[in-house]
A protein has these predicted regions:
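Short beta-strand/loop motif that positions the catalytic acidic residue
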Residues: 117, 122-125, 129
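Conserved alpha/beta-hydrolase fold motif
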Residues: 62-63, 89
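Active-site catalytic motif of lipid deacylating hydrolases and related acyltransferases
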Residues: 2-59
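Active-site nucleophile loop of the alpha/beta-hydrolase fold
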Residues: 11, 34-38, 89-99
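Post-His helix in hydrolase/transferase enzymes
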Residues: 159-174
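Conserved alpha/beta-hydrolase "acid-adjacent" motif
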Residues: 16, 130-136
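Catalytic histidine neighborhood in serine/cysteine hydrolases
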Residues: 31, 142-158
C-alpha cells in the first residue's frame, strides 16, 4: 500500500508537530485529511472532506484516527458509499462528544454513531483519558466491532503523553495493513 493511502484523521484543533500523527506524516509520508476549520468542526463538512479524500484515493486506504477523528470515522462509515475502499481503521482515544462539557464546546457531533464498522478496526483506549472514560472507550469498541487495546494510563494518547513516534501504535497500524 502506498504511504499516501494511509489517511491521518486528527481531532479537534488538529494535531501539533509533536503528536504521533504529525510525526508519522513527516517520517512515512502518510496523508493528513485537511479540514476546512479545525477550531469549529462541523460534522457534515468533516465527513464530506473524508468522503472526497477516500473517493479520490487510487486504491484501498487505511485510516489512522485520533479523538474527534474516531467519531468522524464512525459517522462517515454509517453514510459513505466508499466503505469498501477502507481496509481498516486505527482508532485512538475517541472523544466522548456526548459528555455535556464536550458537547458544549463541539456542537453537532452527538449522538455518536454506534453501528458496527464495515471494515476491521482497532480501538486504543487509555484508563485516564480526560476526554473519554475507559468504560466509554470499551463500549465504543464493542459497538463498532473493533478490537480493544487497553493502553494503560496514557492520558489522551497525544503529544502530552510523551509517546514520540509511538512505535506501539505504528505496530497496531501495520496489523491492519496485513489483514
Amino acid at each position: 500500500m502506498k504511504a499516501s493511502n494511509i489517511l491521518l484523521l486528527p481531532g479537534w484543533q488538529n494535531s501539533g508537530p509533536d503528536h504521533w500523527q504529525s510525526r508519522w506524516e513527516a517520517a512515512h509520508g502518510y496523508q493528513r485529511v485537511e479540514q476546512h476549520d479545525w477550531m469549529r468542526p462541523l460534522r457534515g463538512d468533516w465527513s464530506a472532506r473524508l468522503e472526497e479524500t477516500v473517493a479520490d484515493a487510487d486504491g484501498p486506504v487505511v485510516l489512522a484516527a485520533h479523538s474527534l477523528g474516531c467519531i468522524l470515522t464512525a459517522w462517515w462509515a454509517a453514510h459513505t458509499r466508499h466503505a469498501a475502499k477502507v481496509r481498516g481503521a486505527l482508532l485512538v482515544a475517541p472523544g466522548d462528544v456526548e459528555r455535556p462539557d464536550l458537547a458544549a464546546q463541539i456542537h453537532g457531533w452527538a449522538p455518536i454513531a454506534r453501528q458496527p464498522l464495515p471494515f476491521p478496526a482497532v480501538l486504543v483506549g487509555s484508563r485516564n483519558d480526560p476526554y473519554c472514560s475507559f468504560e466509554c472507550a470499551e463500549g465504543l469498541a464493542q459497538a463498532w466491532g473493533a478490537r480493544f487495546v487497553d493502553y494503560g494510563e496514557r492520558g489522551h494518547i497525544n503529544a502530552e503523553s510523551g509517546l514520540g513516534d509511538w512505535p506501539d501504535g505504528h505496530a497496531l497500524l501495520h496489523t491492519l495493513l496485513k489483514d
